[in-house]
Regions:
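Short hydrophobic/aromatic patch on the recognition helix
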Residues: 51-59
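A secondary-structure capping/hinge motif
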Residues: 63-65
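Hydrophobic alpha-helical connector segments
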Residues: 75-114, 120
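Basic, helix-initiating cap at the start of DNA-binding domains
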Residues: 1-34, 38-50, 67, 76
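Hydrophobic/aromatic-rich alpha-helical bundle segments in the mid-to-C-terminal region
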Residues: 146-189
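Residue-level detection of the helix-turn-helix DNA-binding "recognition helix"
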Residues: 46, 60-61
C-alpha cells in the first residue's frame, strides 16, 4: 500500500477570532493614517485580514463603524430612565441614564481616537448630531412613558443629552483622569444649580 504526501506551496491560513474587533481596529488605524474620506472598505477588510463580504456582515458602511454602539447606548439610557424610582424627578431619571452611560464609557484611548476621526470629517459630525438628536427623542419618550408631560419631558431629555455631550468632551480632553460617570454627575449638579433662583 502506498501513501500519498501532499505538499502545500502556500501556508494555510487559520481562521482568526474577533473579526469585528479586528475590523474596528483596522478602520481606526486607517482613518488616522489616510483620513476617513480616503479609506475604502476594501482597505479596511484587507488590513483586518477578512473579505469585504465579512465587513458587510458586521457593518452597513464605513461610517457606521464609528457609531455601531449607538443603539445599545440609547437602549441602555432608555432602560435606566424607565427603571428610575417612581418618585424620581425628570432630571433624576435622566441622571440614572447618565450613570448607566458611565458603565460603558471606560476605554478613554479608544474614545479619544474615535472623536479625532469624527472631528476630522463634516459628514461624521453631522451623523453624530443626528444620533444625539435621536437619543434625546428616545429619552423624552421614556420620560413621557413615566407620566412626565410636555414640555418637561423634552426639556429634561435635551438637558440630559447636553450634559451627556459636555461630559464626554470633558472626559476625552487631554490631561483628564476622572471617569465619565464622575464628570457627568458633577455636571448634572451644576445644571441643577444653574436653574435655581439666586
Amino acid at each position: 500500500m502506498s501513501s500519498t504526501v501532499i505538499k502545500y506551496h502556500e501556508p494555510m491560513t487559520r481562521w482568526q477570532p474577533d473579526a469585528r474587533g479586528r475590523l474596528e481596529q483596522a478602520a481606526m488605524e486607517l482613518y488616522l493614517e489616510r483620513g476617513f474620506g480616503q479609506t475604502t472598505v476594501a482597505q479596511i477588510a484587507e488590513r483586518a485580514g477578512v473579505t469585504e463580504r465579512t465587513f458587510f456582515r458586521y457593518f452597513a458602511d464605513k461610517r457606521e463603524m464609528l457609531f455601531a454602539g449607538s443603539e445599545h447606548l440609547k437602549q441602555l439610557m432608555v432602560d435606566a430612565v424607565a427603571g428610575a424610582p417612581p418618585a424620581a424627578t425628570p432630571l433624576e431619571a435622566v441622571g440614572a441614564a447618565l450613570d448607566a452611560v458611565g458603565t460603558v464609557f471606560v476605554d478613554l484611548d479608544h474614545s479619544r481616537t474615535r472623536q479625532t476621526v469624527i472631528d476630522s470629517d463634516s459628514s461624521l459630525q453631522e451623523r453624530e448630531l443626528i444620533k444625539r438628536d435621536r437619543l434625546a427623542t428616545a429619552i423624552a419618550e421614556a420620560l413621557r412613558a413615566r407620566g412626565i408631560g410636555e414640555p418637561a419631558a423634552s426639556l429634561a431629555a435635551q438637558a440630559g443629552v447636553g450634559v451627556f455631550h459636555v461630559a464626554f468632551v470633558t472626559w476625552i480632553a487631554p490631561g483628564n483622569a476622572r471617569s465619565y460617570a464622575d464628570i457627568a454627575r458633577e455636571l448634572l449638579v451644576e445644571l441643577r444649580d444653574v436653574s435655581r433662583p439666586r
